Amino acid sequence: MEINNGAQPENAAVSIPSRSPSGKSEKRKSPSIVSGCRTVMNERSFTNYWSVERFTVQLELHNPAEFMLAPKFGDGDYEFVMKLFPNGKDEETAGYLSLFLLINKCPNPRLRFRVSFTVETADGPRSCHLNKNLVTINRSGIVTASKFFSLDILRSAMNVYIPNDILTIGCELTIFGECTTQISSLFKPYQRTHSASSTSRSLSSPNTKCLKIDESSAHDAFTEFLSTGEFSDFIIVASCGREFPTHMCILAARSEYFKVLLRNHSTKEFMSKRLQFDDISARTLDVLLRHMYASAAGRVVKLEEDQLTEDLISAMDRLMINSLRDEVARLIGSKVTVDNVLTRISMAAELRLDDTYDVLLDFFSNHKHECMKLTAWDELESAKPPLAIKILRDAFSNTDSPSTTSMDSRIIDRITLT
């Protein structure tokens, strides 16, 4: 009797399902569809230089609000004109050069651009730029630099800023046009090659010795030098007669005013190593100097509410301590009330803090009837009539049409010295 136990012959073919290494049956992937496109922006750039000879004579011949016009520049689609006020555009800016850029011709209703004004000096170009990286204004609009350059600084270093009695101003414009999107070839990701990675790693090999600097100790040392006067080489005197022993390297590094003043070794201040301010208080100088020394060590000393005074704002603008601008903008834009908005909006206007000015203007627009009943409004009208008119005009324009009218009716004043 034969018993069949189901065993297969040795040479019999056995069918085994195909499986992936993970034990699952493989599934064929459907092909992916890849496409690409690129968006490009049309740009145009213009550069124009204007040299004014016998500039010291021009200063004598022109009163505030009197101006000079440069020839037009541009191309067939765009046309611009520079307008210079040697002694300021009005009495309020009489201590500064004022520079306007007029847009005479533009193919589009609105113009988007980035602008840079420069003064060509014996030490190279000094540039001024807009606080906002990108500016949009209407066709036939005006860009103004009301306080383009201090005449006091110019006169203190005439051989630097007007060599051979020639003032040369440069204007660089980059205009951003419409964007176009086109279908392009397949996108190829950027490859980070092994060689680039190994080069990067080699710069920080274990055998490399690094010098680590304790920032807190540097800050403490700088503050101590200011407090003790150790190693000081320059004396600043406040209006009350209090003396501050300081260090020229810190002053020049943190203030454009002192950089220009101390660069000219023939000035009385440099030779005597002493500078007296008849209109800046000791309290204000103490706040400014502490900030300058802290920022030189990479620290920021926050301003207190009681330190925010008009004396501080004027001194900061005069000494061109640009590193303090963000802290001032933060402080004057917070805890705004009907009682303090007028003082703060005046500060924002003086420092040309345009974003902060717009925020404060919105608050004033919503409470203008209350604000205009305050004594502070009467004082502003009496002390700074042009500013009071500007604030009022901007407020009503802002109320009428927040999206466009305020932008259209205001002259943009956004240039600061760098």
Swiss-Prot record:
GO MF terms held by the record: ubiquitin protein ligase binding
Keyword line? Ubl conjugation pathway
Hey, which pathway is this one from? Protein modification; protein ubiquitination
- Protein's UniProt keywords contain Nucleotide-binding: no
**What gene is this protein translated from?**
bath-41
UniProt-listed GO biological process terms: proteasome-mediated ubiquitin-dependent protein catabolic process; protein ubiquitination; regulation of proteolysis
Would you tell me the protein name for this molecule?
A: BTB and MATH domain-containing protein 41
> MATH domain: from which residue to which, for each copy?
45-173
Segment Disordered: which positions? 1-33
- Any Pfam family the entry gives: BTB
Identify the domain of life.
Answer: Eukaryota
| Subunit (UniProt) | Interacts with cul-3.
Per its UniProt record, what InterPro entries does this chain match?
BTB/POZ_dom, MATH/TRAF_dom, SKP1/BTB/POZ_sf, TRAF-like
What is the source species? Caenorhabditis elegans
Q: What does this protein do?
A: Probable substrate-specific adapter of an E3 ubiquitin-protein ligase complex which mediates the ubiquitination and subsequent proteasomal degradation of target proteins.
Q: What are the residue boundaries of the BTB domain, all occurrences included?
A: 232-293
Q: Which GO terms describe its cellular component?
A: cytoplasm; nucleus
According to the entry, what is the taxonomic lineage of the organism? Answer: Eukaryota, Metazoa, Ecdysozoa, Nematoda, Chromadorea
